[in-house]
Structures are given as structure tokens and as C-alpha cells.
């Protein structure tokens, strides 16, 4: 019998079948096996029992079972191993027909049997190898299903689990092109170790060198073309934009491919997928709620997104998460959301996840309209995650499209209520790292959000592209971005936002295009790093000094605090405060110089205190007659020269504001 999963051994909780209050064997006795908590002597309560042969095959036998003089079960006089398919009750009768023992549930008494049953309940009760199709196995499963052989599916194959709560343990692969669809999995179901692999090996590109340098020339990218499931991604129309000219260079068999082996969880609630892996793999949660992708085991993505939560019809998705794990490659984004809303509790999003070499963005919230409805997302979490070397962007968390703005938002807030890029997305965003993006490191839009602890490193394009309004950014580090010197700013903020703590340590010079900071409507504070002031464009640069401030100079004879007003000049300092050594190191003397720009010459006018250790002040005089409006404040005087520098005079403003002129000396 090949369709039996008999794995519960029929045995007495005692070593041999004995009478319940003695060590005497029940010689020539009989055993009846039935359902738990029933009388197994009644045929209506009995369950099938089998002899298990050495080759693992099973032969069903009739009851009662016979006990020999030694207290062991025999069949036709031979010792045999008897098994059944489930927990059971047991009644034992002696040779005279008297009941000597009754056990309502053997599992309560036998730790070994309990372990077998517990293992079955928490792992599987049905093996795929015992059934011709996955649907047959799913229909037979009670509480679990073991995928113990490779299963070849056809695209669109649908498996209906009938609402059962199952643990599906995968020890083998699902192989096929297209979607394998799981429906009606009960709330609390768990799929562990699933491995999806395409039948077809696609043509892939990898626009980087062996030493991980980006390739941007179309011909160089096409030169990397090869068939592989493990090293690259299938080119898409996005690559036609990223690498101009590549479309005409690619051979026909590398265009329009759509090779993905996708496990689709359709319209389920509370299903978790753990330790998923695969080659050309995808995992699509369509119309799902409170579902989780947990600890992805580095699946290599196919043509579609690797992990997708899509709720374009029905209710907005809620409670859907990517938690932990890592993915590689894929032609689209590693983790993406379409029309999800986590509500005020921010129930949903990405936590503790790593994306490597995504063909588009590492983590993406879709923007704009898809079909006839919005694909935008609200109230999600994006925390503690890393995106490494994506072909496009690291984290793309926008809602409105930028390149082709829509006139309205079907199924969403109208433009009249929330203008372009000003939706109340309310995402919780904290502790994200992007390294080496060929596009933008971190991008988003929206209004009224708080974003903290973002680090972007070594990106070819902008470090941060923020179409945000009235939002607060705290602890943002942009390090060595716009390395390809694109027509891009290292940081761009469109609306009136506040940036508190902007670290720019290690910024590479970008002598070609773009500013270091372009935030024409924002207030920025806490900038650190070697930043060229001419590359800063902000509405307000606020650096409040709390307590004592000290400017230290190491290895130089001077310390300086320099001032620059960009409305006056983006390249020249408007004023400065210097401290210079009098004499050499250790002289114990210095002088202080206060300067101002004049005639487009910085430091043209200066006041010096203690120059040459004189213990006095060097005051500049106006070189010609001073006009009355030269002096600004009362109780002040302004020295000036008159009569071809032969008469030294002073313009004095008395405490009452009256002006008088005094002759100090005639030469």
C-alpha cells in the first residue's frame, strides 16, 4: 500500500503487554485499537492497523491483534511491527476474554509516541511523495504537509487548501515558469523553506565589473550578457533608460523575457513564509493581509519583484511585512508594496531586511496609478534595513510620480486636497543604510513626516532626493555620492523642511555638476564635514551655539571663523574672525583680527587687537570725508581723513543722536 502515512507505532506504554497491576504477560490475549476516548472493541470505533515490512511498505490486517506468551504482538505466529496512522485508544483482554487494561489515549503515557505525534502536528501529516499532485496532497493534509520531492508545476497552477491551517515544510523544490498559486490557506498557516526555481535559464546582464565598478556604457553592459540563474538579472525597459542604446545592442532572445518562478499567496490572512529561497524566484502576496515574509534565505530574483505585497483590488493591504532576511538580483525591486495602509499603528512594512544588486530599487513603495486605481501606500514602517548596490535607487518611498505627474489620483486623495508630492504618507522611517546605488540612494515625498538616521554612501547619483514638505529629518549622513558626476545634487529637498544633523564627512569633490546641498526652502543645521560653501543652497543655515564654543586649529599658525552671505557672493567670504600667533610656537602671544569684505576683496578692512604683542588696538580710518550716514549707532565715533590726508578728524554721534565733527590732528 503506497498511499499510507502510518507513523504511529502500536505499543503498550509498558515494555511488554502485561496485566495492569502485575508483571505477568497477557499470554494469548487480544488487543483492540480505536479512536481516542472510545471503546475500541466496538468495530465502529476501530481504526486501521498495519504491519510495517522491512522495506517500509504496509499491509492492513484485521483486529483484534494477538499477544503471545511473552507479551509481544504476533501475526500468524511471527513477531511483527504494527503501526497506525493516528493517536489511538487501546483495550487489552486476556485469554479468557476479560479486560485487563484500557488506555484512552496512548500518547498521554508514551513519551516516544508523543514526540512522534507532536512532530507530525507541527511539521506534517502528509507527504507530497505519496500523492500524484500537490492539490491531492493539500486535500489530504490535516495539519501539515511535507514537500519531500521536487514538484514541477505549470504557470497558473492553483492549489486550494480549503481554509485549513497548515504547516508546509519544504525539503525539495517547486520548479516551473510562472505562478504557483496557493489559495485558502487558513489564518496561522506557515510555509517554511520553500525553494522556487524556474525551468528556463534566462539571459542576464550584470552592469558591473568583477571588481564591483559600475558599467554605464551600453556596449560594455551588453558584453556581460550570458545565460544564468545565479549571476545577474534579465534586462527590462528600465535598462533601456538607464543605459541608452542598449535596446538596439541586445539580441532578440534577451529582450522581452519574463522568466520568474513565483509562489503566489492569494487572498489569505495571517500566512507566514519563512526562509524562502530560489533561483529566478518571486514571492507575491496578492490581496493578502497580516502576512509576513520572514528571514528570506537569499533568493535570486526573476523578472518580477522578489517580494511583493499587492492589494490593487478589495481592501487596502494591512499588516504585511518583510522581516529579516536577504535577497539578490531580480529585474525589479527586492521588496515592494502596492496599495498598503498600515493605519495609525503603522502595521506593515520592512524591518531588518537586506537587498543586494536589485535590478531597480532595493525597497519600493509604488507610485501613481496602476490600472484604474492608486498604488500608493500609507502608514508603513521602514526600519533597520540595508540596500547594497542597486541598479536604480536604494529606498524609493515616494507616492506621486515625478517624471509624469498625474492630474488626479483615482481611488485616493484628490490633488485639490493634497497637491503633488504633499500626501500625508505618515511612514515610520528610521535607521536605513544605502551603499553603492547607481541611481539615488534615498528618495521619498510626502508632507509632515519625521525621518531619522539615514546613511547613504558611495552612490553614483544623488545621495538623497526628497520631494518632501514640512517634514523633519534628523541625523542624515551623505558620504561620497554623485561619484559619476551626473547632473544631480548630492542632497535635494524641494519643500520647506527642517534638517537637524547633516553629516557630510568624507564628501568627494564634484567639480562638475550639482550642489552638495540644494534645499532652497529648508532650514538646515548641524552640518559637519569638509563642505565647499559655494555648493550649499539653503533658505536658512541655522547653527545655534549652546554654551561655550571653541574653534581649534591644529598644525597652523591661525584659527579662523569665516562668514559667507550667499546673496552677496557664493564664493567670497563677507567677514571673518582670526586669531594669529605673534612670533613662533610657544611665544605666549597672539593677536585677533576682525575683517570685512570691500570692493569684492575679502579681509579688505580689518581691526586688529594686540598685533606684535603691543597690547593695543589697530583701528582703520575712513580714507576720505565720512558722510553723516556712515555712522550707525549713538555713542560712537568714526575716524576719517580730510584734505588729502592732512587732517585727521572724527564723526561723532552723541547719545541723543546729534552728529558733531572733531579735529583730532593736523599734519
From Swiss-Prot:
Reported impact of residue 393 to N: Complete loss of hydrolysis of O-antigen oligosaccharides
Top-tier EC class: hydrolase
GO biological process: adhesion receptor-mediated virion attachment to host cell; symbiont entry into host; symbiont entry into host cell via disruption of host cell envelope; symbiont entry into host cell via disruption of host cell envelope lipopolysaccharide; virion attachment to host cell
GO molecular function, one term: endo-1,3-alpha-L-rhamnosidase activity
InterPro entries: Autotransporter_pectin_lyase_C, P22_tailspike_C, P22_tailspike_N, P22_tailspike_N_sf, Pectin_lyase_fold/virulence
Enzyme Commission number(s) from the entry: 3.2.1.-
Keywords: Degradation of host cell envelope components during virus entry, Degradation of host lipopolysaccharides during virus entry, Glycosidase, Host-virus interaction, Hydrolase, Late protein, Viral attachment to host adhesion receptor, Viral attachment to host cell, Viral tail fiber protein, Viral tail protein, Virion, Virus entry into host cell
Compartments (UniProt record): Virion
GO CC annotation, single: virus tail, fiber
Presence of the UniProt keyword Nucleotidyltransferase in the record: no
Positions annotated as active site in the UniProt record: 360, 393, 396
First-listed, main subcellular location of the protein, grouped into a coarse class: virion
Similarity comment: family membership: Belongs to the P22likevirus tail fiber protein family.
Subunit structure: Homotrimer. Interacts with the host O-antigen lipopolysaccharides; this interaction induces cleavage of host O-antigen. Interacts with tail hub protein gp10; this interaction anchors 6 fibers onto the tail hub hexamer.
Function field: Structural component of the short non-contractile tail. The tail comprises six spikes that mediate primary attachment to the host cell lipopolysaccharides (LPS) and display endorhamnosidase enzymatic activity, hydrolyzing the alpha-1,3-O-glycosidic linkage between rhamnose and galactose of the O-antigen polysaccharide. Digestion of the LPS brings the capsid near the cell outer membrane.
Record remark: domains: The interdigitation of the polypeptide chains at the C-termini is important to protrimer formation in the folding pathway and to thermostability of the mature protein.
Designated name of the protein: Tail spike protein
Protein species of origin: Salmonella phage P22 (Bacteriophage P22)
Gene that this sequence comes from: 9
Amino acid at each position: 500500500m503506497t498511499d499510507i502515512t502510518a507513523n504511529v507505532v502500536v505499543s503498550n506504554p509498558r515494555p511488554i503487554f502485561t496485566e495492569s497491576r502485575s508483571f505477568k504477560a497477557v499470554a494469548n490475549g487480544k488487543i483492540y485499537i480505536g479512536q481516542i476516548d472510545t471503546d475500541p472493541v466496538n468495530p465502529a470505533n476501530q481504526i486501521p492497523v498495519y504491519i510495517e515490512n522491512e522495506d517500509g511498505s504496509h499491509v492492513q490486517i484485521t483486529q483484534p491483534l494477538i499477544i503471545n506468551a511473552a507479551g509481544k504482538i504476533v501475526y500468524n505466529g511471527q513477531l511483527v511491527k504494527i503501526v497506525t496512522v493516528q493517536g489511538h485508544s487501546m483495550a487489552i483482554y486476556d485469554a479468557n476474554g476479560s479486560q485487563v487494561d484500557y488506555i484512552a489515549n496512548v500518547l498521554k503515557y508514551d513519551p516516544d509516541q508523543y514526540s512522534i505525534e507532536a512532530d507530525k502536528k507541527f511539521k506534517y501529516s502528509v507527504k507530497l511523495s505519496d500523492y500524484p499532485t500537490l492539490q491531492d496532497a493539500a486535500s489530504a493534509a490535516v495539519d501539515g504537509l511535507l514537500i519531500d520531492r521536487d514538484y514541477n508545476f505549470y504557470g497558473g497552477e492553483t492549489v486550494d487548501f480549503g481554509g485549513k491551517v497548515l504547516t508546509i515544510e519544504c525539503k525539495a523544490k517547486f520548479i516551473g515558469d510562472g505562478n504557483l498559486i496557493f489559495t485558502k490557506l487558513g489564518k496561522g498557516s506557515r510555509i517554511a523553506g520553500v525553494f522556487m526555481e524556474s525551468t528556463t535559464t534566462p539571459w542576464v546582464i550584470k552592469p558591473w565589473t568583477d571588481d564591483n565598478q559600475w558599467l554605464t556604457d551600453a556596449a560594455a553592459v551588453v558584453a556581460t550578457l550570458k545565460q544564468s540563474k545565479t549571476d545577474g538579472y534579465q534586462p527590462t525597459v528600465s535598462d533601456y533608460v538607464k543605459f541608452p542604446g542598449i535596446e538596439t545592442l541586445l539580441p532578440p532572445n534577451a529582450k522581452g523575457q519574463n522568466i520568474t518562478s513565483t509562489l503566489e499567496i492569494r487572498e489569505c490572512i495571517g500566512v507566514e513564509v519563512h526562509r524562502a529561497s530560489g533561483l529566478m524566484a518571486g514571492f507575491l502576496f496578492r490581496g493578502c493581509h497580516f502576512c509576513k515574509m520572514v528571514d528570506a534565505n537569499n533568493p535570486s530574483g526573476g523578472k518580477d519583484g522578489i517580494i511583493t505585497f499587492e492589494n490593487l483590488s478589495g481592501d487596502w493591504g494591512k499588516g504585511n511585512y518583510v522581516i529579516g532576511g536577504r535577497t539578490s538580483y531580480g529585474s525589479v525591486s527586492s521588496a515592494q508594496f502596492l496599495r498598503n495602509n498600515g493605519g495609525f499603528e503603522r502595521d506593515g512594512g520592512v524591518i531588518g531586511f537586506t537587498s543586494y544588486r536589485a535590478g531597480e530599487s532595493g525597497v519600493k513603495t509604488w507610485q501613481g496609478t496602476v490600472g484604474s486605481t492608486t498604488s500608493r501606500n500609507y502608514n508603513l514602517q521602514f526600519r533597520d534595513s540595508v540596500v547594497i548596490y542597486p541598479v536604480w535607487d536604494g529606498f524609493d518611498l515616494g507616492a506621486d510620480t515625478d517624471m509624469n505627474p498625474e492630474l488626479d489620483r483615482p481611488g485616493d486623495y484628490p490633488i485639490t486636497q493634497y497637491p503633488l508630492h504633499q500626501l500625508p504618507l505618515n511612514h515610520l522611517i528610521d535607521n536605513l543604510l544605502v551603499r553603492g546605488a547607481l541611481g539615488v540612494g534615498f528618495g521619498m515625498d510626502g508632507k509632515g513626516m519625521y525621518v531619522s538616521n539615514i546613511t547613504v554612501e558611495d552612490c553614483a547619483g544623488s545621495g538623497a532626493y526628497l520631494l518632501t514638505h514640512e517634514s523633519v529629518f534628523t541625523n542624515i549622513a551623505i558620504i561620497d555620492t554623485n561619484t559619476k558626476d551626473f547632473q544631480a545634487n548630492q542632497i535635494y529637498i524641494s519643500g520647506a523642511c527642517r534638517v537637524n544633523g547633516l553629516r557630510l564627512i568624507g564628501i568627494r569633490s564634484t567639480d562638475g555638476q550639482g550642489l552638495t546641498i540644494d534645499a532652497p526652502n529648508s532650514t538646515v543645521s548641524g552640518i559637519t564635514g569638509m563642505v565647499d560653501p559655494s555648493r550649499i543652497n539653503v533658505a536658512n543655515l541655522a547653527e545655534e551655539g549652546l554654551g561655550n564654543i571653541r574653534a581649534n586649529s591644529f598644525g597652523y599658525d591661525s584659527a579662523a571663523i569665516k562668514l559667507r552671505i550667499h546673496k552677496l557672493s557664493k564664493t567670497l567670504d563677507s567677514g571673518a574672525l582670526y586669531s594669529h600667533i605673534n612670533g613662533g610656537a610657544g611665544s605666549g602671544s597672539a593677536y585677533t583680527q576682525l575683517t570685512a569684505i570691500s570692493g569684492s576683496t575679502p579681509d579688505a578692512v580689518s581691526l586688529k587687537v594686540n598685533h606684535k604683542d603691543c597690547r593695543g588696538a589697530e583701528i582703520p580710518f575712513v580714507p576720505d570725508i565720512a558722510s553723516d550716514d556712515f555712522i550707525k549707532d549713538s555713542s560712537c565715533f568714526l575716524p576719517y581723513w580730510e584734505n588729502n590726508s592732512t587732517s585727521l578728524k572724527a564723526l561723532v554721534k552723541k547719545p541723543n543722536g546729534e552728529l558733531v565733527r572733531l579735529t583730532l590732528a593736523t599734519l
